[in-house]
Amino acid sequence: MVTEWIQLLIFLFALLIFSPLFGLGLYKVYLYKTSGFEKFLYKICGIDPNRNMDWKEYALSLLVFNFFGFLLLFLILFFQNYLPLNPENFPGLVWDLAFNTAVSFTTNTNWQAYSGESTLSFFSQMAGLTTQNFLSATTGLCVLLALSRGISVNYNVFALGNFWKDMIRGTLYVLLPLSFIFALFLVGFGVVQTFSESVSAITLEGNTQIIPLGPVASQVAIKQLGTNGGGYFGVNASHPFENPSPISNFLQMFSILILPGACVFLYGRITGSIRHAWAIFSVMFTILCVGILIVWTFESSWNPISGTLGFWEGKEIRFGILNSSIWEVATTVASNGSVNSMHDSFSPIGGLVGILNIQLGEIVFGGVGAGMYGMILFVLLTVFLSGIMVGRSPEYLGKKIEKREIQMSILGILLPSTIILLFTAISVSVSDALSSLTNRGPHGLSEILYAFSSGAGNNGSAFAGLNANTTYYNVMIAIAMILGRFGVILPVLVIAGSLAQKKRSEIVSEGSFSTEGGTFYILLLSVIIIVGALTFFPVLTIGPILEHFIMFQNLTF
């Protein structure tokens, strides 16, 4: 137990120390002078890096870029059997699975209704999925940059930056070098990286077993750093070829949260309010710590079904309950979705924490860039409510918060929640959806709820007892992923454009609500819990909460 506490504290302190340092590094990346290679890229792509955009042009560029990324990935997957680097001669994916997978990786969700080692070729994994892991992560970073600039400028609707320049710099100077270095570390610790074909082995029982290989480390590096999460293997980071040792496990857990944590301080530096960034980071850090402690406690508690201490089903013995608990909370507070244990086998309350983390809107660290701009929607709502309470016009970092900003904030917060509840309600009423369940009762409801929470929240993890590789779920979850991603991005860019055209007052007026102290911390935390968590309380009571109490009657589903 002492060793586990030491490991947990090392993990949390590492996150606390390195997040502001990485944030400073990100900030400096976007201050660099244009390099020769960068100029060459701009020239061959026909990009004018000095041309700034308003929010409409920025949004249009982002949507067009992501659409063509989706289209290219769909074609790669659909025509996989005609493309190179397919030593196992895998066929092309059927249209609905190709559609779902292309949407999934384009939206940074990485929901996987297939098992990678038995479905996708090396080319599809590398040129298709890994490429989108880079581009989808940088897309989130671009949106955060646009919002940060919109808040920090005065009367300049064309000060949101250049989407193409932001995309190239984020990929070239942030994700590529970090992923390359991290992949080398992973290879050193035993993660597979090869183009060799699958190996046949004779087991101790005398049976033949096929051991799949592939370029795993290069995909694992960006899937964690980019908060993507999609695994090369079906069981993700539970597989010893993806995550062979406690050291690789620790590094991957840390890499899930480091860039989302750094984005908080990138935002603080661009807007000129580091103390405000620390206040936001404190809220995120608090929710993370509480989540880990709750999951660890319940996963280590008495299991009335097996009559033993601890919920060990679905967990890797080599990692133990603590590492499984940390990973579950880290991967669900971030829009990562990778797993080193099976969430479907967690205790009801342990699973509840994972679902709720996603349903909050992936704002506690969240995705690269995406978590921070999602959190700002809650910050604006908090500032607005506090302004109403004290009877003053709400201000945020020197700018007036008015009707348009609040409308867009509420839209960005409520749209994913509406999608989750609506699509879950439809699915429990449709026979095609119910036929995919392998568990009934409250746990079956939790599996469907988790699937649409994961899709709309762009997380990608799952309660794997649900057979999601059907036309119904492939299409419905893909729609949820699209709306959950771009239904938040567009309101954020509208807010950025609206704030950019306003004057920023450097003088804090008397009676203005401070966004740096303990009062702001408490109010923001309260708004997240009330608006985010209570939205889902009714459905959670008939899902994991009900399952928790039924479990003590020795009933399972």
UniProtKB/Swiss-Prot annotation:
Keywords: Cell inner membrane, Cell membrane, Ion transport, Membrane, Potassium, Potassium transport, Transmembrane, Transmembrane helix, Transport. The chain crosses the membrane at residues 6-26, 59-79, 127-147, 172-192, 247-267, 278-298, 363-383, 410-430, 475-495, 520-540. One of its GO terms (cellular component) is plasma membrane. It is found in: Cell inner membrane. Its main location: membrane. Coiled coil: none annotated. The keyword Transport applies. GO terms for molecular function: P-type potassium transmembrane transporter activity; potassium ion binding. It is a multi-pass membrane protein. Belongs to the KdpA family. HAMAP family: KdpA. NCBIfam families: kdpA. Part of the high-affinity ATP-driven potassium transport (or Kdp) system, which catalyzes the hydrolysis of ATP coupled with the electrogenic transport of potassium into the cytoplasm. This subunit binds the periplasmic potassium ions and delivers the ions to the membrane domain of KdpB through an intramembrane tunnel. The system is composed of three essential subunits: KdpA, KdpB and KdpC. This is Potassium-transporting ATPase potassium-binding subunit. The lineage of its organism: Bacteria, Pseudomonadati, Spirochaetota, Spirochaetia, Leptospirales.
